[in-house]
Curated annotation (Swiss-Prot):
Reaction(s) catalysed (UniProt annotation): S-adenosyl-L-homocysteine + H2O = S-(5-deoxy-D-ribos-5-yl)-L-homocysteine + adenine; S-methyl-5'-thioadenosine + H2O = 5-(methylsulfanyl)-D-ribose + adenine; 5'-deoxyadenosine + H2O = 5-deoxy-D-ribose + adenine
Any GO BP annotation: L-methionine salvage from S-adenosylmethionine
Top-level lineage group: Bacteria
E.C. designation(s): 3.2.2.9
UniProt xrefs under Gene3D superfamilies: Nucleoside phosphorylase domain
Active site (catalytic residues): 12, 198
Family as reported in the entry's similarity comment: Belongs to the PNP/UDP phosphorylase family. MtnN subfamily.
GO molecular function, one term: adenosylhomocysteine nucleosidase activity
CDD domains: MTAN
Annotated substrate binding sites: 78, 153, 174-175
HAMAP family: Salvage_MtnN
Pathway listed: Amino-acid biosynthesis; L-methionine biosynthesis via salvage pathway; S-methyl-5-thio-alpha-D-ribose 1-phosphate from S-methyl-5'-thioadenosine (hydrolase route): step 1/2
UniProt name for this protein: 5'-methylthioadenosine/S-adenosylhomocysteine nucleosidase
């Protein structure tokens, strides 16, 4: 099976890249694509760059050029739910934009005109990730909503404003909704799997720098388990 894995930063893709066999890397429009073999699958690893525009552009190139059957978006995120700690892993059930507001025209908050309010992760991929959850003993793995915006959520006031909009939000980051929206339009199944590098609004910038590598390791190890289970 041909599986695409997307991470925004070098720290988020480096560990998985090192695990690929027969790896070949090429750069298209400034985006790094590495093809290789892992767990019996052909894997295309994309380093997309940070933010929604980079994520949307590179995911479009990925789907047009490499035509993966499924897409997994990995990397770090800021924890939003009160039950979460740094290092925990969140599996998306749904992804939304948290910085889109066209409510003046009767759209839901976060809804892009012409698009659904949120983008549902593929049920089979979520179920597979849930199965892998049961093998994790040292970290907490949960599933829930992830929201995306082009800002790092370190300001407690901004965090509080987002909480008012989304009651059951588990994590925030800067690429997933763009990846999900492109996959939705191309009808390619996707899931987002993110490990927490910080807790949104609580000295997030300090925590991010300190725990990014740990988050990358946790998310990568979990994705390898998913690939091993994927048939």
């Amino acid at each position: 099976m041909r599986i695409a894995v997307i991470g925004a930063m070098e720290e988020e893709v480096r560990i998985l890249r090192d695990k690929l066999e027969q790896a070949e890397t090429e750069t298209v429009a400034g985006c790094e694509f590495t093809k290789g073999l892992l767990a019996g699958h052909e894997v295309i690893l994309l380093k997309s760059g940070i933010g929604k525009v980079n994520a949307a552009m590179s995911t479009t190139i990925l789907l047009e050029k490499y035509k993966p059957e499924k897409v997994i978006n990995t990397g770090s995120a800021g924890g939003f739910h009160h039950s979460l700690n740094v290092g925990d892993v969140v599996i998306s059930t749904e992804v939304r934009h948290h910085d889109v507001d066209v409510t003046a025209f009767n759209y839901e908050y976060g809804q892009v005109p012409g698009m659904p309010p949120g983008f549902k992760a593929d049920e089979a991929l979520v179920a597979l990730a849930e199965k892998c959850m049961q093998t994790e003993e040292n970290i907490q793995v949960v599933k829930g909503m992830i929201a995306t915006g082009d800002s790092f959520m370190s300001d407690p006031n901004r965090v509080a404003a987002i909480r008012d909009k989304f009651e059951n939000l588990y994590a925030v980051e800067m690429e997933a909704a763009a990846v999900a929206q492109v996959c939705h339009q191309y009808e390619v199944p996707f899931v987002i799997i993110r490990a927490l590098s910080d807790i949104a609004g609580k000295e997030s910038n300090v925590s991010f720098d300190q725990f990014l590598d740990q988050a990358a390791l946790h998310s990568t190890n979990f994705i390898v388990k998913v690939l091993e289970e994927l048939k």
